[in-house]
A protein has these predicted regions:
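Short, surface-exposed, charged amphipathic helix/loop patches that serve as local interaction elements
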Residues: 28-106
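Short, charged/polar N-terminal "headpieces" of proteins
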Residues: 1-48
Length: 106
């Protein structure tokens, strides 16, 4: 049986991570002709507060903090290249910005 792996993990391992870490986000980074993937846990308020505070003085350190705190597993190319880490975290944060919500009176 040839099962598709994501960041070297099979479906069972990913389900176990979901149980342990909560909601997971898969990010794909296109670089040249290759697609690299990273699995993040959703950032918490604590993660976002730290990023916001750090980003006021150094935006790249803020992105690095999110990567370090939220990464679960990444393809080797992302792990070894800061540019790809930045793109992966940027996609993670953009996902939060694209999430919509609505409030209305009851």
């Amino acid at each position: 049986m040839n099962e598709d792996l994501i960041c070297g993990l099979d479906a069972t391992q990913i389900e176990e991570l979901k149980q342990d870490k909560g909601a997971l986000v898969l990010v794909s980074v296109n670089f040249g002709e290759n697609v690299h993937q990273a699995i993040f846990r959703e950032p918490t308020f604590k993660d976002l507060q730290a990023m916001s505070k750090i980003s006021k003085s150094d935006e790249l350190k803020g992105l690095s903090a999110v990567y370090d705190n939220c990464i679960i597993k990444a393809d080797e190319e992302i792990e070894n290249r800061d540019l790809l880490k930045i793109k992966a975290v940027s996609a993670l944060m953009e996902r939060a910005r694209k999430t919509t919500s609505e409030a209305k009176n009851l």
